[in-house]
Design a protein with these regions (language model features):
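N-terminal module-boundary/linker segments of secreted carbohydrate-active enzymes
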Residues: 2-21, 25
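Loop/turn elements at helix/coil->beta-strand transitions in domains of secreted/extracellular proteins
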Residues: 3-8, 33-38, 106-112, 156-162, ...
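Metal-dependent active-site segment of extracytoplasmic phospho-/sulfohydrolases and closely related
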Residues: 9, 27, 189-206
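Catalytic metal-binding/acid-base residues of hydrolase active sites
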Residues: 15, 167, 200
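Short, structured active-site-proximal loop/turn typified by the sulfatase FGly-forming signature C/S-X-P-X-R
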Residues: 18-65
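His/Asp/Glu-rich, glycine-adjacent segments
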Residues: 61-189
Length: 206
């Protein structure tokens, strides 16, 4: 198992490129100093949550993986996909390509997902070993606790790939504006939460 790395992929939805310079984000700043950063990024089109998150998971553009918008009509299925429709979100027929958790499982690695787009549906008949149906009422701290519990499992049960999604600061920035005090407070809160996750990861067993 030592040659199989542990990867935790975290998304802060709609975290604007300059939020870390506008607001106090010491955890993200430290991660950037000690890790790798990008100077620019071109999102997939359309710049919506579901198409872009599934593009991250598959490496494919929306016209190749099938999620072309947050809501759309699929003529081949004669169905309307909506992000709030649990039956559609969990219908694997909408999801093309191969998300990274499917690749991981094919390679004998366990995977886990806390709300990543596509994880609620069987893709190629495969889902993460551990996953949660989306529920925005679950506190962010509880999500981190669950991820840390997954990574504390015995080695033969422990996921090597974990995807973790937070719907903020998207919701608050749409409600109050990207430069509002409310968005700033959310950005700083998320940074603190990442600090909790980072500290927890450092304490995990080998």
């Amino acid at each position: 198992e030592r040659d199989k790395p542990y990867v935790v992929l975290v998304s802060l939805d709609a975290f604007r490129w300059d939020y870390d310079s506008i607001h106090s984000t010491p955890v993200l700043d430290d991660i950037a100093r000690k890790g790798v950063t990008a100077t620019r990024l071109i999102p997939s089109f359309p710049t919506k949550t579901f198409p872009n998150h599934y593009t991250i998971a598959t490496g494919l553009y929306p016209d190749h993986h099938g999620l072309v918008n947050n809501s759309f009509y699929a003529p081949d299925l004669d169905l309307v996909y909506r992000i709030g429709d649990r039956a559609m979100v969990s219908n694997g027929a909408f999801y093309g390509g191969e998300p990274v958790w499917v690749t991981a499982r094919k390679q004998g690695m366990k995977s886990a997902s806390f709300y990543w787009v596509g994880s609620e549906a069987p893709v190629q008949g495969i889902q993460p070993d551990y996953w949660k149906p989306y529920d925005e009422e679950v506190p962010f701290g509880d999500r981190i606790d669950t991820v840390l519990k997954w990574l504390s499992l015995p080695k033969n049960q422990r996921p090597h790939l974990v995807t973790l999604y937070f719907e903020e600061p998207d919701a608050v920035s749409h409600g109050y504006g990207p430069l509002s005090p409310e968005t700033g407070a959310m950005v700083m809160s998320l940074d603190s939460l990442l600090g909790v996750l980072r500290t927890g990861l450092a304490k995990l067993p080998d």
